[in-house]
Amino acid sequence: GKEISYNNLLDIDSVIRLVREFPGKIAAAIVKHQNPTGVALGSSAEQAYRTARAVDELAAFGNVTAISSTVDEACANAIKETFVEVVVALDFTDEARSILKKKKNLRLLKTDLVLPVDLGIRLEGRTLAHGMLVQQIDNSLWDDFKVVSKRKPTEEEIQALEFAWRVVKHVRSNSTILAHPDRTVGTGPGQTARVDSFRIAIEKAGENAKGAAAATDGFCFADSIELAHNAGITAVIEPGGSMQDNETIEKADELGMALVMTGMRHFKH
């Protein structure tokens, strides 16, 4: 394929970080402009990829994909159905290579970085007009998993909440992810108003918002809880620590929703 661009490399980094969140599982993540259009688990590479792509078929056009296993013939046939810029995977079978090499602009990257290997890298940085910022890489998940609502989340809701929280940490704040236990269904990335990230995620999810869990990296106020409930979302996970926490908890209890606070905001910028 053609040369890998600067933007491709940024998306490659983002998509690798996403699939590394799910050790021991077959995960697929699809990224555009460093934000996930879909993330999913599956019993095979093909199933994980198809599920991730189906989250938002329109946004997935021209994406960068990562799969935390070997891409086989079935998965390659699925990938070739649409325009993909780059596929990053643990490996590619000979049959998969033969299929995908016919896509002249597609780049294939084989790497074990899709697995949660410890690279020994602890810092990351960004350049500024007047210097550089350096910080520790955010390898944590949460400080706590505290159920603050009267209703406790079900086991299925807990799985969906964790899935959503693992993804939302990689989305620019203010962000919201809607998810079921094995896949995202809606992404609301990088909004200046936290409630707008909820609205966008709900709009993207459509009917799939019903029964989903929501993870938000911004403070979740009562208006977001009500918006989520009206869309059929049953459980929410958020950082907590706002002066309006009590109002948020009261609204969740009023609506019979499960609410979890993590004590940590990933606050990706």
What are these regions (language model features)?
Residues 1-269:
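ATP-dependent carboxylate/acyl-activation modules
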